[in-house]
Swiss-Prot record:
Belongs to the pneumoviridae phosphoprotein P family. Residues 1-30 are annotated as: Binding to monomeric RNA-free nucleoprotein. This is Phosphoprotein. One of its GO terms (biological process) is viral life cycle. It comes from Human respiratory syncytial virus A (strain A2).
Length: 241
């Protein structure tokens, strides 16, 4: 049968723990330094000595290391910590490298109302050439956007891998946008063709029907006879419908 260590509870366990800490307290403490102050921290009624180290300012960037040879604070060297990141002041509008790019962007997308909205001829034109022409213009605009974004990325100070990653992501986004626009345009073209066929069928029916007479189906004739004759023998049943 296995043997287990004895268990202690209550006051007996507290006394044994206190004796154990007092027995090992001298093994881990270093010789006292007259220049360092000692503080006592009480943890669960057990006194443990903690050596107070030299202070380091936490809210300042200046570190004052302790010099054991000099006792005066005036002779202690001050080390200025260098900032991890340095920022330059914003350039003036005339020196801004992106001002020309911004101007070209505004000029590219300004005053393009004819290309950005459907005209009357484009709405009534059912040919595939119209859709293809619009897709070509969309592709051209997206290519210009990609070129300007690429220029902006190259102008910025970044690693080569980051620039390549952004360029690849923008190319993938461009291809995805073109595919979505192409699919939507083809669906629109199919709808327009279906509407044109229905319109042609209605026009053919109207052209063939030149008489002013209106023909009634069998159910309508029975209803008409019932209203005109007022005869009980002409009552309708559910089977008539």
């Amino acid at each position: 049968m296995e043997k287990f260590a004895p268990e202690f509870h209550g006051e007996d366990a507290n006394n044994r723990a206190t004796k154990f800490l007092e027995s090992i307290k001298g093994k881990f403490t270093s010789p006292k330094d007259p220049k360092k102050k000692d503080s006592i921290i009480s943890v669960n009624s057990i006194d443990i000595e903690v050596t107070k180290e030299s202070p380091i300012t936490s809210n300042s960037t200046i570190i004052n290391p302790t010099n054991e040879t000099d006792d005066t604070a005036g002779n202690k060297p001050n080390y200025q910590r260098k900032p991890l990141v340095s920022f330059k002041e914003d350039p003036t509008p005339s020196d801004n490298p992106f001002s020309k790019l911004y101007k070209e962007t505004i000029e590219t997308f300004d005053n393009n109302e004819e290309e950005s909205s459907y005209s009357y001829e484009e709405i009534n034109d059912q040919t595939n050439d119209n859709i293809t022409a619009r897709l070509d213009r969309i592709d051209e605009k997206l290519s210009e956007i990609l070129g300007m974004l690429h220029t902006l990325v190259v102008a910025s100070a970044g690693p080569t891998s980051a620039r390549d990653g952004i360029r690849d992501a923008m190319i993938g986004l461009r291809e995805e946008m073109i595919e979505k626009i192409r699919t939507e345009a083809l669906m629109t073209n199919d709808r327009l063709e279906a509407m044109a066929r229905l319109r042609n069928e209605e026009s053919e029916k109207m052209a063939k029907d030149t008489s002013d007479e209106v023909s009634l189906n069998p159910t309508s004739e029975k209803l008409n006879n019932l209203l005109e004759g007022n005869d009980s023998d002409n009552d309708l049943s559910l089977e008539d419908f």
